[in-house]
Amino acid sequence: YAAGRWYAASAEGHPLLDAATGEEVARISSAGLDLGAMAHHARTVGGPAIRELTFHERALLLKELATHLTGLKDEFYELSLSTGATRRDSMIDIDGGFGTLFSYAGKGRRELPNARFIVDGATEVMGKTGTFVGQHIMTPLQGVAVHINAFNFPVWGMLEKLAPTLLAGVPAIVKPATVTSYLTEAVFRAMIESRIFPEGAIQLICGSAGDLLDHLDCQCAVAFTGSADTGRHLKSNKTIIENSVRFNQEADSLNFSMLGPDAAPGSDEFDLFVKEVAKEMTSKTGQKCTAIRRTLVPGNMVEDVMKDWSRRRGGCARRRRWRRPHPSA
């Protein structure tokens, strides 16, 4: 969705396959898309329109959008199956995303003024006579926010970035990860069709982002979620460096859980440890950025921990073995 219209690439595109059945779900390509025009549209159309609103007005739009999307979530759940997600996985992604919109809507009305700017701190007197004073204020950036998202949360990943961006009064261009972009596109399409936010406030690129970063300036920002290598590559872009473009990177993390030597088998702490690690190994097939990827267990407890893990994981395997291609749990 670029510069106020839906765009279909002239190229054949790359097929996106159902993770369970291997059937083609969609094709993806951004070939021929004028990325400079998208950035210009955000600056000249989306930015002025959303900056006209106060923080409270933007917050109310976030709430309206969250309510609207929640009413459509069953169709998003159905499409989410093709990404390889179970219903529980989808709840984290879809309901979690909508919940984020609700959360920022509430924070915007509770914590921010019903104004277009924020007064930052007290007035500072900078002259002996008191006639020379200064006051800091915070206003929206005049550029565009570019959101480059990861594959594991096609809905929540988009909405967790959009919520604070739109609340701040900045237009955004969303670039979802390729393999699950069809789910992002479905939710985004519902957002556009709702006409809740003004035109130009949000745009979408499915496929390569091409030279988009080359069209950014010092009033723009990039929020990236993905691998550290890709993040370093993007951050070293000549335009990003020369124009001092704000760049926020959420990359590889290694979370661990440690079992204390006093948490004996049968204790509440032992059961909690095993339960949480097993949950993190299976939720989103262990691909959450916050997943526990390493455990530290006292040597004399390893056998007990492995036995309990095997029991929990074995139960999951037996339940899933007889499911249809699309799991529902």
Task: Map each language-model feature to its residues.
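Hydrophobic residues in well-ordered beta-strands that form the structural core
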Residues: 174-175, 206, 249-251
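Beta-loop-alpha module in the N-terminal Rossmann-like domain of NAD(P)-dependent dehydrogenases
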Residues: 145, 152, 206-213, 226-233
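ALDH superfamily catalytic-core signature
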Residues: 190-195, 219-221, 229-329
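A structured beta-alpha segment of the ubiquitous adenosine-cofactor-binding alpha/beta core
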Residues: 134-135, 202-223
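Residue-level signal for inorganic ion chemistry
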Residues: 22, 58, 169, 202, ...
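N-terminal Rossmann-like NAD(P)+-binding subdomain of aldehyde/semialdehyde dehydrogenases
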Residues: 1-129
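Short Gly/Pro-enriched turn/cap motifs at secondary-structure boundaries
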Residues: 5, 135-137, 285-286
